Amino acid sequence: MTDVTVKSLAAEIQTPVDRLVQQFADAGIKKSDVDSVTQQEKEILLAHLNREHGSVPNKLTLQRKTRSTLNIPSTGGKSKSVQIEVRKKRTYVNTPEAEQAKAEEQAQREAEATAQKIAEEKAKREAEEQAKREAAEKAKRQAAEKEKVTNQQTDEKTKPAQTDKARREAEAAELKRSVEEETRRKVEEDAKRVAEEARKMAAENEGKWPEPVAEQTESADYHVTTSQHARAAEDENDAKVEGDRRSRTRGGKATKQKKGNKLSESKADREEARAVGRKGKRKPSTLQQSFNKPVVAVNRDVVIGETVTVAELANKMAVKGSQVIKAMMKLGAMATINQVIDQETAQLVAEEIGHKVILRRENELEEALMSDRDIGVEAAAEHRAPVVTIMGHVDHGKTSLLDYIRSTKVASGEAGGITQHIGAYHVETENGMITFLDTPGHAAFTSMRARGAQATDIVVLVVAADDGVMPQTIEAIQHAKAANVPVVVAVNKIDKPEADPDRVKTELSQYGIQPEEWGGESQFINVSAKAGIGIDELLNAILLQAEVLELKAVRTGMANGVVIESFLDKGRGPVATVLVQQGTLNKGDIVLCGFEYGRVRAMRDELGRDITSAGPSIPVEILGLSSVPAAGDEVTVVRDEKKAREVALYRQGKFREVKLARQQKSKLENMFANMTEGEVSELNIVIKSDVQGSCEAICDSLEKLSTDEVKVRIVGSGVGGITETDATLAAASGAIILGFNVRADASARRVVETEGLDLRYYSVIYSLIDEVKQAMSGMLAPEYKQQIIGLAEVRDVFKSPKFGAIAGCMVTEGVIKRNNPIRVLRDNVVIYEGELESLRRFKDDVSEVRNGMECGIGVKNYNDVRTGDVIEVFEIIEIKRTIA
């Protein structure tokens, strides 16, 4: 323990420093106010003070309750029964005299008990000896009687013998009497000796017993008694008081009590006083509270989680919320009392106020759950099949290539011939098994391609020999490099006449993909998905690359993997396509998957067959999750379903808190930008898709379409069919409903018809994005353009009583039309802009005058037309704007 100074010790025990120094001096320790005090010196001082002032005597507090019924006569003549409860409290103190008397009494009782026990043992032994002597005497008497009967015949002869017998009997009686007296004397001596030893023990214990001092309290009512007689007398006194009270009540002399003005007197005290009929003065009570304001600031240990509201932080520090907000304003942060702040901000605020911060890790339960897993550490890692992701630009033949390898017709089943989902398949070849992931090539599926690159071992980059490197090809290269995955290039459509593989190599080399023949690390294989050219070479190249990577995994133990895709099936519930990466996934396992959890109720392979287990690099569909997980979430098998549920709920709450904190922060930072939001048009959309990945891709693509004038707002999105809830949401928010590979049920269609909603179905993402663009274009404010349609040169000016100044003009360009807006130019400078009011040719009103003809032009509300001016006639054209 750290030593403290005399001054700090005096402040701690709230005593003057001079008095504490004097007490140390009395205890034989010389100290000044700046000297340090050790723990041993504290104990010496405490022992000295105990000797001087003594210790608090031991005390015992007893509480008693008595209940009775009091009949009070009322004005109506009927008596009123009142329940009376009297509570009494007695405190008994163990004083030195009581302790001494108790010790002597105890010693005396022990001595008496010991003496009684010894006496009983002596008496028992004496009784046994007496019984033996009586038996011997009885035998002697019987022998004597027998001898007497025998010698009766010779009475005369035996007279001297009888005299001897009487003498012997007298001697035996005298001996018996002397033995009894000796025994009684010994018992009395033993009892005296035991009593003397008991008194000596009591005297020794009296010296060893601690000497208590009476407690120095003025208000305590201590009854120093422990005997049964004292308690009996007290009970008699209570009964007497109660009897007097009853007699006074029956006599109708209930005493009025004075109303006290003590705020501290309770209703129970008043009832007790009324019951016992007290007339005397009540015990005065103080009206001040016992709380003393802390003199020194209290420094607390504040435990802060990853996120906390301002109100919770103030509660932890025992201060008002306004004080926390004030401290945050000093640090340059604005917040409300219900706002969620992050851990770093809360730490700065708590330290600013002066408290010690303890940062808490809130994912302890998750760490404990993950540590309690059988991951098969003792088992040896075995070779596993490579996971190959096929990437490339749209329509470059990725699915067709995989289709030829699998010998199925997957490409024909895709809407529009393009892949909308990540397809996961494993293929058995002659040289081993390969797992393929087919990713979409459309720009909208960027996140799906990135997800495929994270879960893969090898990327097969498909490039069309006749098309070359395209934008999605470059994006696929970036994903592969970010994931640090080797790339095998498949130059497809090599059978076309316009194929140019060398151009593909040259273009890819600009992005860091160098072929092996040029000294690089990437294998280039020329293939044709239609003709089947180079397929075996491609598979061998993949297996060769996998052999170089030495891919291994533990097959035993609890499995973990990644969600490739997920969707909601109407009959089966949430379905997730999972790629197992470690261990073995069995039917019935408890899995934790992102925000969701559940037990694997069924497992199916890519062909729809039910299976019971799946090892590393095997893609499977699992059923039994609580909801549809997000694609890309990690799947982990755990032991306890209850803990898995707690972790999933914690993750959901954590995600919500972080999202809310991020929204609050962005609101404050973008305050000025949000002031102009009222001028922006919004297109509200509700999106429902068949799988999670497509839903994400569509939402990202539509949000990227937002401009400064039209903003796309995704009101709702989800997986599964369009329900009545979706239709109601769209009706409330004025949104259009877009279904991607899903349909609306009967109740939803009924709401759509009733509310007149716009419901559209799509199976190709191109069409969906194009139509949303058209809808956004219709919401744009129109753009107007001025187009000059004719020029007329003023040759002469003459007056008209009806129109004023009339300009005689020659049309030099275009056509002059009546009632069109015009400009008057003088020296190529616009001096007036107005409207053409009158157009005549040979005194006839005409609607238009063409190039090379003369006409008279009257300008509305303008008479300052001069010779040499140019009249420019134009029209305003509305240009329809579109979203780029």
From Swiss-Prot:
<feature type="compositionally biased region" description="Basic residues">
    <location>
        <begin position="247"/>
        <end position="261"/>
    </location>
</feature>
<dbReference type="InterPro" id="IPR009061">
    <property type="entry name" value="DNA-bd_dom_put_sf"/>
</dbReference>
<dbReference type="InterPro" id="IPR004161">
    <property type="entry name" value="EFTu-like_2"/>
</dbReference>
<feature type="binding site">
    <location>
        <begin position="492"/>
        <end position="495"/>
    </location>
    <ligand>
        <name>GTP</name>
    </ligand>
</feature>
<dbReference type="GO" id="GO:0005525">
    <property type="term" value="F:GTP binding"/>
</dbReference>
<dbReference type="Pfam" id="PF22042">
    <property type="entry name" value="EF-G_D2"/>
</dbReference>
<dbReference type="InterPro" id="IPR027417">
    <property type="entry name" value="P-loop_NTPase"/>
</dbReference>
<dbReference type="GO" id="GO:0005829">
    <property type="term" value="C:cytosol"/>
</dbReference>
<comment type="similarity">
    <text>Belongs to the TRAFAC class translation factor GTPase superfamily. Classic translation factor GTPase family. IF-2 subfamily.</text>
</comment>
<feature type="compositionally biased region" description="Basic and acidic residues">
    <location>
        <begin position="99"/>
        <end position="209"/>
    </location>
</feature>
<keyword id="KW-0648">Protein biosynthesis</keyword>
<dbReference type="InterPro" id="IPR000178">
    <property type="entry name" value="TF_IF2_bacterial-like"/>
</dbReference>
<dbReference type="Pfam" id="PF04760">
    <property type="entry name" value="IF2_N"/>
</dbReference>
<dbReference type="InterPro" id="IPR023115">
    <property type="entry name" value="TIF_IF2_dom3"/>
</dbReference>
<dbReference type="InterPro" id="IPR053905">
    <property type="entry name" value="EF-G-like_DII"/>
</dbReference>
<dbReference type="InterPro" id="IPR044145">
    <property type="entry name" value="IF2_II"/>
</dbReference>
<keyword id="KW-0396">Initiation factor</keyword>
<keyword id="KW-0342">GTP-binding</keyword>
<dbReference type="InterPro" id="IPR006847">
    <property type="entry name" value="IF2_N"/>
</dbReference>
<dbReference type="InterPro" id="IPR013575">
    <property type="entry name" value="IF2_assoc_dom_bac"/>
</dbReference>
<comment type="function">
    <text>One of the essential components for the initiation of protein synthesis. Protects formylmethionyl-tRNA from spontaneous hydrolysis and promotes its binding to the 30S ribosomal subunits. Also involved in the hydrolysis of GTP during the formation of the 70S ribosomal complex.</text>
</comment>
<dbReference type="InterPro" id="IPR005225">
    <property type="entry name" value="Small_GTP-bd"/>
</dbReference>
<feature type="binding site">
    <location>
        <begin position="438"/>
        <end position="442"/>
    </location>
    <ligand>
        <name>GTP</name>
    </ligand>
</feature>
<feature type="compositionally biased region" description="Polar residues">
    <location>
        <begin position="216"/>
        <end position="229"/>
    </location>
</feature>
<dbReference type="Pfam" id="PF00009">
    <property type="entry name" value="GTP_EFTU"/>
</dbReference>
<dbReference type="InterPro" id="IPR015760">
    <property type="entry name" value="TIF_IF2"/>
</dbReference>
<dbReference type="GO" id="GO:0003743">
    <property type="term" value="F:translation initiation factor activity"/>
</dbReference>
<dbReference type="InterPro" id="IPR009000">
    <property type="entry name" value="Transl_B-barrel_sf"/>
</dbReference>
<feature type="compositionally biased region" description="Basic and acidic residues">
    <location>
        <begin position="262"/>
        <end position="275"/>
    </location>
</feature>
<dbReference type="Pfam" id="PF11987">
    <property type="entry name" value="IF-2"/>
</dbReference>
<feature type="region of interest" description="G1">
    <location>
        <begin position="392"/>
        <end position="399"/>
    </location>
</feature>
<dbReference type="InterPro" id="IPR000795">
    <property type="entry name" value="T_Tr_GTP-bd_dom"/>
</dbReference>
<keyword id="KW-0547">Nucleotide-binding</keyword>
<dbReference type="Pfam" id="PF08364">
    <property type="entry name" value="IF2_assoc"/>
</dbReference>
<feature type="region of interest" description="G4">
    <location>
        <begin position="492"/>
        <end position="495"/>
    </location>
</feature>
<keyword id="KW-0963">Cytoplasm</keyword>
<feature type="region of interest" description="G3">
    <location>
        <begin position="438"/>
        <end position="441"/>
    </location>
</feature>
<feature type="region of interest" description="G5">
    <location>
        <begin position="528"/>
        <end position="530"/>
    </location>
</feature>
<dbReference type="Pfam" id="PF03144">
    <property type="entry name" value="GTP_EFTU_D2"/>
</dbReference>
<feature type="region of interest" description="Disordered">
    <location>
        <begin position="93"/>
        <end position="288"/>
    </location>
</feature>
<feature type="binding site">
    <location>
        <begin position="392"/>
        <end position="399"/>
    </location>
    <ligand>
        <name>GTP</name>
    </ligand>
</feature>
<feature type="region of interest" description="G2">
    <location>
        <begin position="417"/>
        <end position="421"/>
    </location>
</feature>
